[in-house]
Regions:
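Residues within well-ordered alpha-helices
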Residues: 2-3, 105, 137
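FAD-binding core/adjacent interface of flavoenzyme oxidoreductases
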Residues: 3-93, 165-167
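Alpha-helical scaffold elements within enzyme catalytic domains, especially in hydrolases
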Residues: 5-6, 108, 140
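A Rossmann-like FAD-binding core segment of flavoenzymes
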Residues: 15-31, 36, 43, 111-167
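Short alpha-helix boundary/capping motifs
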Residues: 51, 75, 99, 130-131
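Residues that line or immediately flank small-molecule/substrate-binding pockets and catalytic motifs
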Residues: 52, 97, 161
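Rossmann-like NAD(P)H-binding beta-loop-alpha module
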Residues: 80-129
């Protein structure tokens, strides 16, 4: 998703690299700072929903700091991954995690022609779903060429022959 595609799809004006620095409930406004320019401005709201986000889980595993490994949580993370793919043209990717974000990334990487494997500790994708729904998702992913390694854990990463082995 880009801010433009998010707006065209949902009519939501997404501001990337901006931070809310103050909330003014009496005026129904927030103070926003552009992290690239330092400019601050006021933005009004009807209802304010606080969604501070989360940091992706990144376990302490051997090799986790390799430059060919990425976490995906923000639009900026997407840009980093896209830039890497455009510059290096990898043929395959292993995704650790089979939730909403992992499945969406798998779909996008397959559309780019990459071989994709999802490694997931639980024995099903989309853990919150029941087994029947998960089974449908498994079949769809396999039908579209995504390999599934369910019930497996990632133990670490090792750089080899210009790529990364997932242990």
């Amino acid at each position: 998703q880009t801010p433009e595609s998010f707006f065209s799809r949902f009519h939501v004006n997404m501001k990337v690299r901006h931070e809310v620095t103050a909330i003014h409930p009496e005026k129904k406004e927030v103070t926003v700072k552009n992290l690239e320019t330092g400019e601050e401005f006021e933005e009004s709201y009807d209802k304010l929903i606080l969604s501070p986000g989360a940091k992706p889980t990144q376990p302490r595993l051997p090799g986790v700091g390799l430059d060919k490994l990425f976490t995906l949580r923000t639009v900026e993370d997407t840009f980093c991954i896209k830039d890497y793919i455009n510059a290096n043209h990898p043929k395959s990717a292993v995704l650790a995690g089979g939730g909403f974000i992992g499945l969406e990334l798998a779909e996008n990487l397959r559309e780019l022609g990459m071989d994709v494997t999802i490694v997931q500790r639980p024995k099903q994708l989309m853990n919150p779903f029941d087994a029947d729904m998960a089974s449908f998702i498994h079949n769809e992913m396999r039908k579209h060429g995504v390999k599934l390694a369910l019930g497996h854990t990632v133990e670490g990463f090792e750089e080899r022959d210009g790529g990364v082995d997932v242990l």
